[in-house]
Curated annotation (Swiss-Prot):
ATP binds at residues 38-45, 155-158, 192-195. Homodimer. This is Pantothenate synthetase. Keywords: ATP-binding, Cytoplasm, Ligase, Nucleotide-binding, Pantothenate biosynthesis.
Amino acid sequence: MNSTKENPVEIIRTRNELQARVRAWKQAGETVGFVPTMGALHEGHLSLIEKAQEKVTRTVASIFVNPAQFAPGEDFDTYPRREGEDIAKLASVNCDAVYLPTVAEMYPEGSVTNVRVESLSDLLDGIYRPHFFYGVATVVARLFLHAQPDVAVFGEKDYQQLQVIRRMVRDLGFPIEIIGGATRRDADGLAQSSRNLYLSPDERRAAGAIYSAMHRAASRMALGTLPSEALKEAEGYILTAGFRKIDYVTLVDPATLQALPADTPLEDGAAARLLAAAWIGKTRLIDNISVTR
């Protein structure tokens, strides 16, 4: 809803500043959309800002590399941090403000309260990264309290995360509408991700195979092929393309994320979600697509 303007994005670094800004907007009759990120922004992130702008009159993005969602040995220290570039990108899509809190601002000394979304956090990525969704739910709950938005937009590329946040909002009664934004892809189908920056040229050339394999599997299952057959073929294709390890390629219920039977075809009219996680070199890529028969 924002019109083109020349004003730069407002930089906000504390909870009090952010709440004062949002309060002033709301008192003036504005509505507020929020897009939390960890920075290293790409077109996928910017599309989430633009989706929020379809619903609200003001948009806020946050950039915070959340230590609570990284386990020892993961890439917290090496995760790309590009504050200046990110702010320029947000300004290019007329984002009104960017929230850049410190760790101390998000987790004041002595904080002991965390948010755990049972069941949804323990499947799929939760098996391989058991710390991850507890860190995500906790930081997003805190960011919601800081930003107090009317609408928040999360990418469907992180589909399990989106479902965890939706459940948390429902269970805790946050008065926030959660919207999923479509996955942005490169020309070869690879889902845009900040971690794609880790890929070597050879790895990048091979990485699109994860989407190609999923797309073929989804098409076959939509025509009645057994999931077990389609998923096995997808795994083989991914490994042959140069991925070194697969964590999972699985078909799940879109809402509960519970695995669907692999030995029976999808029923006519049934909807499912195909999710995958695999390693190429030292980089773990995830992706998902919808499947409908």
